[in-house]
Amino acid sequence: MMVTLVLKYVLVIVMTLILRVLYDSICCYFLTPRRIKKFMERQGITGPKPRLLTGNIIDISKMLSHSASNDCSSIHHNIVPRLLPHYVSWSKQYGKRFIMWNGTEPRLCLTETEMIKELLTKHNPVTGKSWLQQQGTKGFIGRGLLMANGEAWHHQRHMAAPAFTRDRLKGYAKHMVECTKMMAERLRKEVGEEVEIGEEMRRLTADIISRTEFGSSCDKGKELFSLLTVLQRLCAQATRHLCFPGSRFLPSKYNREIKSLKTEVERLLMEIIDSRKDSVEIGRSSSYGDDLLGLLLNQMDSNKNNLNVQMIMDECKTFFFTGHETTSLLLTWTLMLLAHNPTWQDNVRDEVRQVCGQDGVPSVEQLSSLTSLNKVINESLRLYPPATLLPRMAFEDIKLGDLIIPKGLSIWIPVLAIHHSNELWGEDANEFNPERFTTRSFASSRHFMPFAAGPRNCIGQTFAMMEAKIILAMLVSKFSFAISENYRHAPIVVLTIKPKYGVQLVLKPLDL
């Protein structure tokens, strides 16, 4: 009798849980999207008709396959139709504001800069990353700062901020100079030969972030870089299937490989962490070090910020990805632009030698005087921003300009389209013209957002800009760059904007 009663209770609990999951799934995949769609239609905002479960993903995929199927016929920068063909098509059909569907997740496209400013500043506390975004990167960078929301984001931002103080940045500069010198010496041996500069920049920035994040464990940091590069690609591919309920639990090829690589990445991180902890425990070292990992371990040891090992690993993965990926691409595209615009290359070289001397090694204090270089970097970030879009989800109903944004609606800010807008930048918006950052003072405007904007802007942007200036100043003073005849201009998007075939340059060492 008692056994029967227990079984009945268990059955009731199980059925209740099943019904709860079923109800939540129906709300998530059908009722909430339908409610948001009707709510926005009443405000006059429509968009392409979504398919069941997949939304507009198939349509976007077809457009991207067509637009990026061929290389560019020449080196030009009118890349919005190539990388955002769906934006170009639907903005013409539905206007500046339209709703598109990433599976069952509705996304409002927004390009009006005043509203974007309001969203990223005033409404920052009640917006953030969506569930789909978090799931798409969970296997890659976990719950680090990049994907955190609300109190978790504030907590992690506060935790990471000491790593980017002015004094710490000065300390990082020596690693940047040292690593660049070693690379330059190696490149000097390849006189007149073609160099895939993108691969060189990936190695260089991975070396720098390994030293600044892991210090004496930088060799393992380089191994970690290789694993994270593969893991990033797999997660980007697996994200396409997240619109299907339960897809992340299926034993698919992508899911198995992601799980295996994630385990290997975290094993390697644990080795680095355990090595630091052992050194302190046996008295070989008096602290965990002054790099990012040491800073986090010191906070955990002193019971600050409620840190645990998993949080430290997620932050390490996050900063490793953001700390080398975006900067290596910035350097790659900037060197391509300088090689394609020799007059600006000469201007920057003359400025570097005048400010920094013949060896071209800048001090941190001299970087602000490299105005031509700064303009070139900003123009590179405008034409080829690290990411094509900036997403935010509303966690409660908000008033944005003349719109009411309902809870659960994601807002999709097409950064690339804004950076290339003739309306905002003039008729030469698709041309390389660094002078625009002098005459029009756009560097600090709401039209320019390579590192996002508002309280949630990129915490490492000062680090990235310092690194880019040091590396470019040293390289341009030691080499001249020319585009190789083998270079094929074909930008693509794999989370970030990348050159499909790399960037082949011919380097010529300069006699000093």
From Swiss-Prot:
Membrane-spanning parts: 2-22
Tissue-wise expression: Specifically expressed in roots.
Domain of life per record: Eukaryota
Molecular function in Gene Ontology: heme binding; iron ion binding; monooxygenase activity; oxidoreductase activity, acting on paired donors, with incorporation or reduction of molecular oxygen
GO CC terms: membrane; plasmodesma
Lipid bilayer topology: Single-pass membrane protein
UniProt keywords, alphabetically: Heme, Iron, Membrane, Metal-binding, Monooxygenase, NADP, Oxidoreductase, Transmembrane, Transmembrane helix
Binding site for heme: 458
Listed EC numbers: 1.14.13.-
Catalysed transformations (reactions): N(6)-(dimethylallyl)adenosine 5'-phosphate + NADPH + O2 + H(+) = 9-ribosyl-trans-zeatin 5'-phosphate + NADP(+) + H2O; N(6)-(dimethylallyl)adenosine 5'-diphosphate + NADPH + O2 + H(+) = 9-ribosyl-trans-zeatin 5'-diphosphate + NADP(+) + H2O; N(6)-(dimethylallyl)adenosine 5'-triphosphate + NADPH + O2 + H(+) = 9-ribosyl-trans-zeatin 5'-triphosphate + NADP(+) + H2O
Subcellular location: Membrane
Gene3D superfamilies: Cytochrome P450
GO biological processes: trans-zeatin biosynthetic process
Keyword presence, Repeat: no
Induction comment: By trans-zeatin, cis-zeatin and isopentenyladenine in roots. Down-regulated by auxin and abscisic acid in roots.
Cofactors (names): heme
Function: Cytokinin hydroxylase that catalyzes the biosynthesis of trans-zeatin via the isopentenyladenine riboside 5'-monophosphate (iPRMP)-dependent pathway. Can use isopentenyladenosine-5'-monophosphate, isopentenyladenosine-5'-diphosphate and isopentenyladenosine-5'-triphosphate as substrate.
Family: Belongs to the cytochrome P450 family.
Protein name stated in the entry: Cytokinin hydroxylase
Classification of source organism: Eukaryota, Viridiplantae, Streptophyta, Embryophyta, Tracheophyta
